Amino acid sequence: MKDHDFDGDKGLAKGFLENFADANGRSKYMEILQEVSNRKIRAIQVDLDDLFNYKDESEEFLGRLTENTRRYVSIFSAAVDELLPEPTEAFPDDDHDILMTQRADDGTDNPDVSDPHQQIPSEIKRYYEVYFKAPSKGRPSTIREVKASHIGQLVRISGIVTRCSDVKPLMAVAVYTCEDCGHEIYQEVTSRVFMPLFKCPSSRCRLNSKAGNPILQLRASKFLKFQEAKMQELAEHVPKGHIPRSMTVHLRGELTRKVSPGDVVEFSGIFLPIPYTGFKALRAGLVADTYLEATSVTHFKKKYEEYEFQKDEEEQIARLAEDGDIYNKLSRSLAPEIYGHEDIKKALLLLLVGAPHRQLKDGMKIRGDVHICLMGDPGVAKSQLLKHIINVAPRGVYTTGKGSSGVGLTAAVMRDQVTNEMVLEGGALVLADMGICAIDEFDKMDESDRTAIHEVMEQQTVSIAKAGITTSLNARTAVLAAANPAWGRYDLRRTPAENINLPPALLSRFDLLWLILDRADMDSDLELAKHVLHVHQTEESPALGFEPLEPNILRAYISAARRLSPYVPAELEEYIATAYSSIRQEEAKSNTPHSYTTVRTLLSILRISAALARLRFSESVAQSDVDEALRLMQMSKISLYADDRQKAGLDAISDTYSIIRDEAARSKKTHVSYANALNWISRKGYSEAQLKECLEEYAALNVWQIDPHTFDIRFI
């Protein structure tokens, strides 16, 4: 079998890089090479989809490239060396430039030097790295599908990143200086382990019959950034009864720091064997471990701050922003298969959007994340809502209370396999940093484990002092918890405090504690049954009157909204302060208060109002935002207020009148607008139809007069 002509392949690579044009007719790769020459970028990513679509390229060349990828990385690098244009912009010289200039002055950069050890390797001259991105045709492989036949080939693998090491320097070219003859000696390093030179291989030392003394010159040597990551199979790819498999991924150069634990990603890379080292090598025999040398990383769900909008997405977001009913459309697009819970879905939408974080001049931080606890009877779709929110959020971690220890939620001290040092391994709350942590069965957690959440929910850090490590980790996460009442179902004969059975210190940290009670109601149960049957028959939700938004559009809209930092205007200060004090007064009057109101409640009102302003793409909070925030807080306990009214013997019409009268007296008004009256009674769970009935009944009694056009109220 004759040797393959790799020089011919280098010519093909040069032709592709030189002549390939994108859809706009621009020389894509020559523009990238110009930016590399100007030292603006270091990575040259060759997309094999471009190579597949290139008219002058044969399928055999693409096949050879994917089956012997490491060799073709060096072939493309050699082609880039020949094609690299002259820089068009000035840039300051770094240490590497100074060394290369000095070598040129000394004449040591001459490639015709007879001694191969004194020839400067091409690798040390390069400022760039060449990466291949695998063709996007077909679905990515799972870890289980990558076998021994794929060794040396370019593969695409999807999975979730479970851990990442620190970024360390990895030697690519070792440079020595001989103390006896003064020559520079170069040693290319192709693996993570190498044997340093102890004898000078130069011709002068050999002629003088001397061993020489090569001294390693670290500043002249070339190092690459190196990071090791562990990737695990996604849950949906694991067969029944099996445990998820994992794979080691090596990231070099510009690919480091691209992933973090918890990210769902797709790696393109070269599947390679690596021999065991140390004591493992004694027992391994002919068995080798495997790893993936990554050449590209693609995130399935981009972080909000990394989101780059496509033109069509920008147009769609602009159209949605102009829609007056966007708040309802976005909330109803969350889990449309789940019947009802409209207000809960609105609250969960606001949890996804959040409020801006505030940092005061003295360094004090005020959190912007909204925490929500869903507490209710079994079978009201709490867990389904949690899982759906985790799917929509770009970064989310789902865990259960009984299956999570305090260490599993915060951080554990472990020994790093790469460096053998004691390192911190982040728990669920740390993995969900800048995202959402959903904790199901919150009431089943041990009290000692639950205390780990207190610091995270307010200070948004995890403080650790164990195994000689004293540090603080960021956990800027929104906590979404689901719990059952103390006796499995809510017992109306007991007080809310007895039913909820969570400490006040924890309850006050939740912006919204939503009680979902499963009450028997003929009409509601009939509608629910029809909805569930429709979903089972058609595997899709019933018609909503509009097309529900896809999760990627939801993420794009929320990403655009999160870039705003709305402020509270001065004219709303009095209004918010009055609303907060009235909540405190109502709670003080009640024999069995339904909520635990502290100053944190005031901050919760501000956070929810700011999230609503973000949804409107507004730079300032409006009164309507504050009213909606207060309404959501009231609606979260609405089922309990209905019981209070029944116990007090009040009918809906009388109670509606009492609410309007008390609010008008508090604000010292004799003239009340219809919008204000509707807002006041909706906070208490009454409908617009009940308001109209109340207005007519009390107008007939001459208690007030109603404007025939605007329906505004004037007390007599």
From Swiss-Prot:
A single cellular component GO annotation: nucleus
Gene Ontology annotations of biological process type: DNA replication initiation; pollen development; regulation of DNA-templated DNA replication; sugar mediated signaling pathway
GO molecular function, one term: zinc ion binding
Stated induction or repression of this protein's expression: By both rootknot and cyst nematode infections.
Reaction catalysis annotation: ATP + H2O = ADP + phosphate + H(+)
UniProt subcellular location: Nucleus; Cytoplasm
Main location: nucleus
Residues the entry annotates as binding ATP: 376-383
Ranges of residues in domain MCM: 326-531
Domain of life: Eukaryota
Short motif (Arginine finger): ranges: 508-511
EC annotation from Swiss-Prot or TrEMBL: 3.6.4.12
Sorted UniProt keywords: ATP-binding, Cell cycle, Cytoplasm, DNA replication, DNA-binding, Helicase, Hydrolase, Metal-binding, Nucleotide-binding, Nucleus, Transcription, Transcription regulation, Zinc, Zinc-finger
Annotated PROSITE patterns: MCM_1, MCM_2
Gene3D superfamilies per UniProt: 2.20.28.10, mini-chromosome maintenance (MCM) complex, chain A, domain 1 (3.30.1640.10), Nucleic acid-binding proteins (2.40.50.140), P-loop containing nucleotide triphosphate hydrolases (3.40.50.300)
Keyword Hydrolase found: yes
Function summary: Probable component of the MCM2-7 complex (MCM complex) that may function as a DNA helicase and which is essential to undergo a single round of replication initiation and elongation per cell cycle in eukaryotic cells. Required for megagametophyte and embryo development.
Annotated family: Belongs to the MCM family.
Protein name as annotated: DNA replication licensing factor MCM7
Source organism per UniProt: Arabidopsis thaliana (Mouse-ear cress)
